[in-house]
Curated annotation (Swiss-Prot):
Oligomer status and interactors: Heterotrimer of UreA (gamma), UreB (beta) and UreC (alpha) subunits. Three heterotrimers associate to form the active enzyme.
Gene Ontology terms, MF aspect: nickel cation binding; urease activity
Swiss-Prot/TrEMBL GO biological process terms: urea catabolic process
GO cellular component annotations of the record: cytoplasm
Top-rank lineage group of the source organism: Bacteria
pH dependence: Optimum pH is 7.0.
UniProt protein name: Urease subunit gamma
Role description: Ureolysis may allow urea to be employed as a nitrogen source for growth and produces ammonia which may protect from killing at low pH.
Pfam family, one: Urease_gamma
Protein keywords: Cytoplasm, Hydrolase
Subcellular location per the Swiss-Prot or TrEMBL entry: Cytoplasm
Family affiliation: Belongs to the urease gamma subunit family.
Temperature dependence: Optimum temperature is 60 degrees Celsius.
Annotated gene: ureA
C-alpha cells in the first residue's frame, strides 16, 4: 500500500486517537498527545462525514473535560488547528479552549 505523507499522518492521528479513546474509556487520564489526537481525529472524521466547520468547532470543545486529562494539560492546549478535507474543499478548523 502506497500512502502519501498526509495519509500516513492521518493514520497516525487515527491510531493515537483510538489508543486515547481506549484509555479514556478505562478512566485513565489523557496526556497532551492523546488529548490532541482525540480532538484532531474527531475534526477530521466529522469533516469527512459532512459536518460544517461551525459544528465541528462547537462539538470538539465538548469532547474532553478537565477530569479526562492529566493536571495542567487543559492549560497547555489553548487551541487546536486542524486542516480537514470537507466535501467541497480543505478548510482550517480552529478549536479554541478545546478542553472545558
Amino acid at each position: 500500500m502506497q500512502l502519501t505523507m498526509r495519509e500516513q499522518e492521518k493514520m497516525m492521528i487515527s491510531l493515537a486517537a483510538m489508543i486515547a479513546q481506549r484509555r479514556k474509556d478505562k478512566g485513565i487520564k489523557l496526556n497532551h498527545p492523546e488529548a490532541v489526537a482525540l480532538i484532531t481525529d474527531y475534526v477530521l472524521e466529522g469533516a469527512r462525514e459532512g459536518k460544517t466547520v461551525a459544528q465541528l468547532m462547537d462539538e470538539a470543545r465538548n469532547l474532553l473535560t478537565r477530569e479526562d486529562v492529566m493536571e495542567g494539560i487543559a492549560e497547555m492546549i489553548p487551541m487546536i488547528q486542524v486542516e480537514a478535507t470537507f466535501t467541497d474543499s480543505t478548510k482550517l478548523v480552529t478549536v479554541h479552549d478545546p478542553i472545558q
